[in-house]
Design a protein with these regions (language model features):
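Residues lining hydrophobic/aromatic ligand-binding pockets adjacent to catalytic sites
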Residues: 1-148
Length: 148
């Protein structure tokens, strides 16, 4: 089992001069980041899906073995609350499947208000595993009912 270490993104202007050299262009931040870390979360996919050309540019900026961990769209987790999300999952994975060799786990962060419901969760996981078995997933439950 490989251990990958990274952060929840690489595009932080506060890092310039601290992590990133002062003279480096923002367009080169990911390439520089990938010399120090070997994975990163893609947080923007939670808010809106990146364009395919953007994802391709990211893929070209990192070495083989680097892993991107895209965060599942909030439309799936927070708006639809895991129900009736097949079309939304298709849109999400269509963006990232071209770089599947660079994908780490997909982060599924649930809203703090989403209580555990066995039927909803089972149907969601079943649809993921049936249609997208090649991916790995990390589920972040944030409501106390998930503990039981």
């Amino acid at each position: 089992m490989a251990l990958h270490i990274g952060t929840s993104g690489w595009s932080y202007k506060e890092w310039k001069g601290f992590f990133y050299p002062p003279v480096i262009k923002t367009t080169d931040w990911l390439s520089y980041y990938a010399t120090v870390f070997d994975c990163t979360e893609i947080n923007m996919s939670f808010y809106h899906l990146p364009k395919q050309q953007t994802v391709d540019k990211w893929a070209n900026a990192v070495p083989a073995g680097f892993k991107f961990c895209p965060k599942m769209s909030r439309y799936v987790t927070h708006i639809k609350r895991l129900k009736d999300v097949e079309d939304s999952l298709d849109k999400f994975f269509n963006v990232f499947d071209p770089i599947s060799d660079l994908l780490g786990p997909v982060l599924i962060q649930l809203p703090p208000s989403l209580k555990y419901d066995h039927d909803i969760v089972a149907a969601f996981i079943q649809s993921l595993l049936k249609k997208y078995p090649m991916h790995r997933y990390a589920l972040e439950a944030r409501h106390a009912s998930w503990i039981n």
